[in-house]
Amino acid sequence: MLMLAAVMALRAPTAGAQSADPRLLALSCAGCHGPEGRSPGTIPPLHGQNEAAIAAALRSFRDGQRPSTVMARIAKGYPDQEIDAVAREIAAQWK
C-alpha cells in the first residue's frame, strides 16, 4: 500500500502544471516491476520491452481497455505526452 501511495504521488499533475520528471516516474515502476524491470510472479516484466509497446500498454490501462488491479489507477492521470516520456525512459533503462 505504501508503494501505491508513492506511485500515486508521482503521477501526472493537473492540467496546466509542469510535467513530472520521466526518470522519477520510471523509478516508481520498479516498486512492482523490479529494479531492472524483471518482474517477480505474475506482474508483467518491462525488461526488454520497446517504447511503443510500453506506451500502448499504459494507454490501454488508462483508457480502461486492458483489465488490471493497480495499473488503471496509476495510468489514469497521465496525458499522452507523459506516457510517451515514461515509456521512452523505461525502454532505455531496461533494455
Task: Spell out what each predicted region is.
Residues 34, 63, 91-95:
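Residues at helix-coil transition
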